Regions:
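Noncatalytic carbohydrate-binding groove/subsite architecture in carbohydrate-active enzymes
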Residues: 1-94, 101
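Aromatic/acidic polysaccharide-binding cleft in carbohydrate-active enzymes
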Residues: 60-171
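Short intrinsically disordered, low-complexity coil segments enriched in acidic
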Residues: 1-10, 151-152, 182, 189-191
Length: 191
């Protein structure tokens, strides 16, 4: 909620910038998640704060761009293509938080193919003359593919709570780095 754009565009008191009654303009904000993923303690809090502002003005949210940056220290920053699960699970956690806590109805990645950086889902290797080369996939590509495959347009979220064996609510279990993050989905046909 940097710069109060939600309020500026959708609060009727913002006389110079209000768009809320403009025909054919959806009540929707798009945002990039750069520099909002670390430290982990702020990942959820920042998205909850965003959701609060969105709900206050009845505005939807699309997360319109994410890629690995230098501050993503948990996975070594953005340099060096990573074909392993480390980056894939890191990004899956970001997607989870954007959908669950910020209420993102759409989620986009930065780019599909790249060089020796973590922002490409596929690593390209080209010859010096740029006329030949090869490509290599990453686990990140498959993690994003699973979100695309199993969360379809029109899907809705259901609120679920986790409890321990004694029946006590487990607060914030999904932000525990050592804990298990679990999502379950039901298809339209009930399966």
């Amino acid at each position: 909620q940097r710069g109060y754009q939600i309020q500026a565009f959708f609060c009727p008191d913002s006389v110079d910038t209000y768009l809320g009654d403009t025909p054919n303009v959806p009540r929707l904000m798009l945002g990039h998640s750069y520099w909002t993923t670390t430290p982990l303690s702020e990942l959820r809090a920042m998205r909850c704060q965003l959701r609060e502002a969105l709900d206050k003005y009845n505005v939807g949210f699309w997360q319109s761009e994410t890629c690995i940056m230098g501050n993503d220290e948990e996975i070594g920053g953005g340099h060096g293509f990573d074909r392993t699960m480390k980056t894939a699970l890191y990004v899956a956690r970001i997607i989870h938080h954007d959908i669950v806590y910020a209420g993102a109805k759409s989620w986009q990645w930065w780019r599909a193919i790249g060089g020796d950086y973590k922002d490409g889902l596929i690593r390209e290797y080209t010859n010096d003359d740029l006329k030949d080369g090869r490509v290599e996939d990453s686990k990140l590509m498959w993690a994003l593919g699973n979100y695309s495959r199993f969360i379809r347009p029109g899907a809705v979220r259901l609120s679920v709570s986790a409890f321990d064996q004694a029946g006590n609510l487990i607060p914030g279990g999904d932000t525990d780095q050592k804990g298990l993050m679990c999502s379950a989905y039901q298809n339209a046909d009930g399966s």
